[in-house]
């Protein structure tokens, strides 16, 4: 009789082994940011029913906003796997901040990058990630 395979509770879909080294580094950085910078402030924000805008400046400075935007426009130039990993780590702490991050990164920055003129990209993309 064959031995039963063990279930990996930390990585049930075995995604980690499919990631590149860069993707793991991005995930780990996002996890660290979420644990160190986001988590301690979320409870306080809930208690006072407010959002801390400084978190978004810090996300931009860390390269978590506009992750797929080319570096030439102030983004991180990462792939969409990295973007998904960043979103997952922020979501793990708070879905509201992840939603705001996604709106800024995907619904605002991506259309400007994909469809904006060079002048529009130069004018806005380097500003909105911080």
Residue ranges with predicted function:
Residues 1, 128-130:
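Polar low-complexity intrinsically disordered regions
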Residues 1-22:
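Intrinsic disorder at enzyme termini
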Residues 25, 32, 37-128:
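Glycine-rich flavin
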Residues 2-6, 27-32:
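Short, flexible segments with low predicted structural confidence
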């Amino acid at each position: 009789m064959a031995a039963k395979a063990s279930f990996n509770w930390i990585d049930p879909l075995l995604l980690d082994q499919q990631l590149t080294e860069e993707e793991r580094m991005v995930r780990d950085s996002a996890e660290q940011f979420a644990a160190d910078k986001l988590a301690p402030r979320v409870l306080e924000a809930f208690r006072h029913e407010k959002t801390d805008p400084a978190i978004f400046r810090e996300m931009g400075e860390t390269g978590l906003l506009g992750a797929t935007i080319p570096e030439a426009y102030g983004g991180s130039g990462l792939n969409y796997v990295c973007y998904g990993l960043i979103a997952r780590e922020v979501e793990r702490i708070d879905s509201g901040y992840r939603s705001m991050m996604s709106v800024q990164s995907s619904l605002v920055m991506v259309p400007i990058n994909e469809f904006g003129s060079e002048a529009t990209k130069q004018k806005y993309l380097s500003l909105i990630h911080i």
